């Protein structure tokens, strides 16, 4: 269910430099090494040290979001759900989970959601990551060295149903592997 996308995962928290090193060195496919960089930060003067996260391609942020954009999307969806279909108190938690899932599907997240997605990815198989309900986990899987060319080609049909911003990483990987022309 869509509401399961945002369920908080209890995973051991690593340092950001450790997470980045694993993503860029251990997991990233050789064809994209030096081209893809992961970025996350929290701002010490911000309430609760909120921050932002991004994935860069050759120094350009191709996917980025921050706490404030993420929270605005969550709150907008939550108030819409509470004013229409989920008015009773029993459905508040479901409305919150659906709101977080909706915001993530829209491509908005904060650094904490980014870290949680990595924790999920790092603690499950590539097969489970490719079909994860969390789109960030699917991106990590699409860029993973364990995903071979045959398997990448086999994903083509399922990518037609994928979120646009996730599909863009599939195209990037296909081009890097020489399986698709650069347009």
What does each model-identified segment do?
Residues 1-6:
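Short, small-residue-biased leader/transition segments that mark boundaries at the very start
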Residues 7-183:
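Alpha-helical scaffold segments
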């Amino acid at each position: 269910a869509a509401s399961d996308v945002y369920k908080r995962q209890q995973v051991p928290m690593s340092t950001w430099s450790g997470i980045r090193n694993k993503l860029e060195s251990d997991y990233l496919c050789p064809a994209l090494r030096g081209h893809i960089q992961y970025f996350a930060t929290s701002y010490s003067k911000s309430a609760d040290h909120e921050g932002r996260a991004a994935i860069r391609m050759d120094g350009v942020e191709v996917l980025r979001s921050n706490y404030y954009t993420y929270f605005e999307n969550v709150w907008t969806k939550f108030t819409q759900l509470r004013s229409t279909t989920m008015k009773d108190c029993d459905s508040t938690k479901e409305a919150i989970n659906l709101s977080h899932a909706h915001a993530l599907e829209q491509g908005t997240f904060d650094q904490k959601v980014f870290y949680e997605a990595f924790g999920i990815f790092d603690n499950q198989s590539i097969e489970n990551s490719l079909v994860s309900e969390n789109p960030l986990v699917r991106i990590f899987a699409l860029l993973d060295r364990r995903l071979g060319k045959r398997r990448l080609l086999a994903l083509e049909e399922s990518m037609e149903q994928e979120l646009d911003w996730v599909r863009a990483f599939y195209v990037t990987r296909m081009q890097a592997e020489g399986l698709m022309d650069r347009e």
